[in-house]
Design a protein with these regions (language model features):
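Metalloprotease/metallohydrolase-associated module, dominated by Zn2+-dependent proteases
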Residues: 1-89, 93, 109-160
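Active-site recognition of the HExxH zinc-binding catalytic motif
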Residues: 96-108
Length: 160
């Protein structure tokens, strides 16, 4: 199995995992930008955490997030919600991977790629990659059979 290959087995605690991964893999180059240097990854995460809309959309989201690198030989990037930590695999420095892992911190759930996670990821993509990227990912999720809760857009606080 290639180091970045996604495991396709169905996990009964996370039945959408393989669908989410397949959908994301099919549009990876179309969602957000490629982050060329590690400092670009750090700056992207800092910009998200500093954006007032982040807390407006997700009032309980962590603001103090630990970001670290994983070696290229690691199988995948990973989020550790109980530690507010994101580990990004070398070679996976792109906006969608960062937003995917951040979504795990924002929406920790018994079902890691469940409907709330998908809605969170879509909201982050819309805010930080733009509407076209959001529409692309949303339609790709639908085409792959991925279910999502309602996507939060912003609270009334942000409307002033």
């Amino acid at each position: 199995m290639a180091p970045n290959a996604r495991d396709e087995r169905i996990d009964t605690n996370d039945p959408q995992r393989h669908l989410v991964y397949a959908a994301e893999d099919s549009v990876l180059d179309d969602i957000g930008r490629r982050l060329r240097r590690w400092t670009d990854v750090e700056a992207f995460v800092e910009a998200i955490l500093a954006d007032p809309a982040y807390l407006d959309l997700f009032p309980d989201a962590p603001l103090d997030v630990v970001l670290d690198r994983r070696s290229r030989s690691a199988r995948a990037s990973v989020a550790l919600p109980d530690r507010a930590t994101i580990l990004i695999r070398d070679g996976s420095w792109n906006a969608l991977t960062v937003l995917h892992e951040l979504s795990h911190l924002v929406s920790p759930d018994r079902e890691p790629h469940g409907v709330d996670f998908v809605a969170t990821e879509l909201a982050l993509v819309r805010r930080f990659c733009g509407f076209d990227a959001f529409a692309t990912l949303a339609s790709t999720f639908v085409a792959h059979g991925v279910a999502a809760a309602s996507v939060p857009l912003a609270s009334a606080r942000g409307a002033d």
